[in-house]
């Protein structure tokens, strides 16, 4: 299979950005669909809370697409590029699932998705410039933070919202696997100040996306 030229890779990254932010998405795997207990009815308040939380999760997947796209662009290691691209395809499932669930809840995606994508893409490029080990370390830390964030959402999502809870649980399982794969590929441990900075940026994103 012919390797893409640098120009082709940049064009592909631009196309990925536009499709992630503006296009509808299809999943390669069906969304988890648990049996619904007819005795568990969601109130309007439940739906509003779930929509806000799933919007935050959707933003997280927009950022994941940007991170993996930029890191795939930054590495010259074809095996590592393939790993990033595979993880991005799984994250596309998450993007499609959260998007569809938001529609079911009469919610909406974040108005700031172009900004979230651009910021995450820039961070991924910086990580990529620091070398493959640092780039993989960035993946590990990101996925661990997302995994913890999803666990917190499982505590906050209404008990009656079994559909959203099933989606978030599967997403958390996938994120843990992505972190483990990055560790196995040779991830470096990021300095503590960098991890703190990443947590601060993630907190800003989640608190903003919860509302807009």
Swiss-Prot record:
GO terms for molecular function: 3-demethoxyubiquinol 3-hydroxylase activity; metal ion binding. Binds 2 iron ions per subunit. It catalyses: a 5-methoxy-2-methyl-3-(all-trans-polyprenyl)benzene-1,4-diol + AH2 + O2 = a 3-demethylubiquinol + A + H2O. Its cofactor is Fe cation. Pathway: Cofactor biosynthesis; ubiquinone biosynthesis. Keywords: Cell membrane, Iron, Membrane, Metal-binding, Monooxygenase, Oxidoreductase, Ubiquinone biosynthesis. It holds the Pfam family COQ7. GO terms for biological process: ubiquinone biosynthetic process. Fe cation 2 binds at residues 91, 143, 175, 178. This is 3-demethoxyubiquinol 3-hydroxylase. It comes from Methylibium petroleiphilum (strain ATCC BAA-1232 / LMG 22953 / PM1). The lineage of its organism: Bacteria, Pseudomonadati, Pseudomonadota, Betaproteobacteria, Burkholderiales. The gene is coq7.
